[in-house]
Amino acid sequence: MSATSVYGDHKGDWVTEKSDTRPSSSNGIDRLMAEKLWTSLFNEKQLSLQIFRLSGIYSNENNVLVRLKSGNTKIINKENHFFSRIHVEDIANILFNSLFTFKPGEVF
């Protein structure tokens, strides 16, 4: 599993799995390096690999409502700013289903 931070800032352009990776944060740089190392290792061992680039993960215990109640919020007020979020249970379902519909070399 990786993260969407590997894409970096695309200045408002639409980002897909096929978009260029140009991370700007240390987390994004580290995750892209890890992706490349895993890919290299799997190629060397002739194994198949799928990469899942996850966005902001939330759960019933960790979400905006919980943070609002606790007073632990960060307000971001930018015009046309969007967030990409995914629930932890959706991640579990996707990973489970990927075992049966494996697509070697795919990035999701």
Language-model segments: residues:
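Glycine-rich "substrate-gating" loop/helix at the edge of Rossmann-like oxidoreductase active sites
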Residues: 23-28, 55-57, 78-86
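Flexible, glycine-rich beta-alpha linker
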Residues: 47-66
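Short, glycine/charged-enriched secondary-structure capping and boundary segments
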Residues: 12-16, 64-69
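Alpha-helical substrate-binding/gating segment
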Residues: 65-73, 80-108
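SDR active-site strand-loop-helix element
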Residues: 1-4, 52-54
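Conserved catalytic-site region of short-chain dehydrogenase/reductase
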Residues: 4-14, 57-61
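Catalytic helix-loop patch of NAD(P)-dependent Rossmann-fold dehydrogenases
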Residues: 11-51, 76
